Amino acid sequence: MHEYIERVVDLTDPNETELLNISPDEARQRMLGGAPESVRNFDGSFALVAKNGKAVKLARSLDRPLRYFLAKQIEGPALIVAHRIDAIRKWLEEQGFGDQFHPYYTRMVPAHYLVTIQLVGCPDPDPTYERFFNPVRNKYSTDLDPIGHDYIAALKSEVRKWIERVPENEPIGCCFSGGIDSGAVFLATYSVMRELGCDLGRL
């Protein structure tokens, strides 16, 4: 009986994954062995691929794109994973599979889901989706003050983590359009820098 050889081609850039509380290898082990909720504890920015036998698991944070394409080979399926569609297309063309490519055949891993693909033969991918981010709905009343307080507290917490990782001799920049969103980020950054005793001239 012919034994298919499954292949995973990971074209993602490992330097674009920035996890603050866990290493990428530990994160992949959790993806393979833990409940989807364990991915919820990843603190940072990530787009990860983990493989165990014929099972491939994919997960990403909201700010990191992660696309995949299942190429058909005689010896078995090849799952190509990348941040961008053009990287997938380039690899297929270099390997002689360019005629299989079409942008519609690529899929984006949805943020906040642990996606599992079984590399069995060469069917169309039939992934399963397990959500790892499940915020509580209707948690607040219609009073805007506690909502605003928690929103700004969460924003400042993330800004603080970022600032603490920037060398003290480097400037700190914020994209500021003058709108309420970028204005909130700018003011939160200013506030955190004051609390940390940073030189405000860096901002």
Say what each PLM segment does.
Residues 1-203:
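Cysteine-centered catalytic environments shared across enzyme families
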